[in-house]
Curated annotation (Swiss-Prot):
Transmembrane segments: 78-98
Mode of membrane association: Single-pass membrane protein
Protein name: Pheromone-regulated membrane protein 5
Organism encoding this protein: Saccharomyces cerevisiae (strain Lalvin QA23)
Low complexity: bias regions: 238-247
Gene that encodes it: PRM5
Biased segments, Basic and acidic residues type: 250-261, 309-318
Length: 318
């Protein structure tokens, strides 16, 4: 018979059990002798005991330190940690997608704006430049150029001559001044400096007007008609007229000394071509057709010519 006593505790423990074994044996021997005799049986008792250890898990009843995991799946801790890490990763991925998309849209909008601003079809010649003054912008939008079919065959040769003259006189200074999208105060002479000199701007405009006077043919642009069939002056005539008005101040003599040209300009082939009878006729026709502004050339003698005439005894008018 084995008796096990278990104490109620929260931790496993070793228990000792005692077992008793009783063995009873009896033997009887009967010897038959000629004479009859009898013997008593012998009784023997033996007792043995052994200790058997056993592990008993603690009960969760009334024990707050044992989690009741009967309703939860296995690996709950790993599932929770993985879910938190996944949420963080998805948040970072969503933020990256949103910022990339917004920056891409901003870049595209900037590129579209720059392509509109600096493309050949959105310059100030088409009236779409925001840097142009509003009256000049309206002037360019209302211009309608005469087609090639409207030019008579007799004028085509003269137009070819005009083109040759314009190429020989180098139109680059004029184009550089017409195409600049800045105000007239920022000229070629002072645009690299933060200081804007009114005197320098007047000198710059005066040099331009003198250059126009020496090359009247360059002032003649194709006849431009507005929507009201009224001829308009070009930007060249506008600039030359505004610069000519600036010569009325007291600095006219000082400015004139600064812009004198050598005498070889008067003897250039382009000058002879401009002074030829055919060129004068074409100038008159262009005047009657477009009423364009032509500035009469009025040049002062060069210092060398003035000294020669003074030595020869000739009087020169200032």
């Amino acid at each position: 018979m084995t008796v096990i006593t278990i104490a109620k505790r929260g931790l496993p423990k070793l228990t000792t059990s005692t077992s008793s074994t009783t063995t009873a044996s009896s033997s009887s021997t009967i010897t038959s002798v000629x004479s009859s005799s009898s013997s008593l049986p012998l009784l023997s008792n033996s007792t043995s005991s052994s200790i058997i250890p056993s592990i008993t898990p603690p009960s969760r009843n009334g024990n707050p330190y044992i989690l009741d995991s009967g309703d939860m799946p296995n690996g709950t801790v790993f599932i929770v940690v993985g879910g938190i890490a996944g949420v963080i990763f998805l948040a970072i991925l969503l933020w990256w997608v949103i910022t990339t998309y917004s920056s891409h849209r901003l870049t595209r909008s900037v590129q579209d704006y720059e392509s509109k601003m600096f493309s050949x079809q959105h310059t100030q010649f088409y009236g779409d430049s925001p840097y142009m003054d509003y009256p000049a912008k309206e002037n360019f939008q209302d211009q309608v150029h005469i087609s090639e079919s409207d030019i008579s065959p007799g004028n085509k040769d003269e137009s070819v001559k005009d083109a040759l003259v314009s190429h020989t006189n180098n139109e680059k200074p004029f184009l550089s001044n017409f195409e600049r999208p800045l105000s007239s105060l920022v000229s070629e002479s002072n645009r690299n400096s933060l200081f804007i000199s009114p005197t320098g701007d007047i000198l710059y405009k005066t040099r331009l007007s003198k250059l126009y006077q020496e090359s009247p043919r360059l002032l003649q642009k194709p006849v431009i008609m507005t929507s009201d069939n009224v001829s308009t002056n070009s930007l060249v005539s506008t600039i030359s007229s505004s610069s000519a008005s600036s010569l009325d101040n007291g600095n006219e003599k000082e400015v004139g000394e600064d812009i004198r040209k050598p005498a070889k300009i008067a003897s250039s082939p382009s000058r002879k071509l401009l002074n030829s009878p055919e060129s004068d006729g074409s100038v008159n026709r262009n005047h009657s057709k477009g009423n364009l502004l032509v500035v009469q050339s009025k040049r002062k003698p060069t210092p060398s010519t003035y000294l020669e005439h003074m030595l020869e005894g000739k009087e020169q008018d200032e």
